[in-house]
């Protein structure tokens, strides 16, 4: 039997799994989960409030934005996808490599920028999502054969 989880519980659990610990915040990284922090406080032009964020000061690095819902919500609903995409749009003003995660405690959809991609069926540590942008090596021998 699936146990109902409030959005607060889902957000807190997701923050722990992803490793979005506020104590890791530094001069080179904005990181955390919450419901009070606005994008404006994170250096963007919006009063919207993300559920979770990983925002390196190096804008060439991968940024992660988390949108959580309670466990009864269908994360494939267009309104939730649009909410995540709106948050991706906000941070895309500074970052070109963005992972957007939509999560309800049981189901997960992951977007590389705004493209839905196949990933692990359970939420992973942030490094897993950062690695989605690693360059694939080119096999020159295969190309020229």
Question: What residue ranges belong to the model's regions?
Answer:
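A short, conserved, highly charged catalytic patch centered on acidic carboxylates
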Residues: 1-99, 107-144
């Amino acid at each position: 039997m699936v146990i109902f989880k409030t959005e607060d519980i889902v957000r807190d659990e997701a923050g722990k799994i992803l490793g979005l610990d506020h104590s890791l915040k530094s001069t080179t990284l904005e990181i955390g989960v919450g419901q009070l922090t606005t994008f404006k406080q994170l250096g963007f032009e919006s009063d919207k409030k993300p559920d979770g964020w990983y925002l390196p000061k190096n804008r060439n690095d991968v940024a992660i934005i988390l949108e959580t819902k309670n466990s009864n919500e269908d994360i494939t609903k267009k309104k939730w996808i649009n909410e995540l995409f709106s948050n991706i749009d906000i941070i895309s003003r500074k970052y070109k490599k963005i992972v957007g995660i939509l999560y309800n405690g049981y189901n997960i959809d992951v977007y590389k920028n705004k493209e839905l991609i196949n990933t692990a069926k359970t939420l992973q540590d942030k490094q897993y999502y950062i690695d989605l942008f690693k360059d694939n090596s080119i096999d020159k021998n295969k190309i020229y054969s």
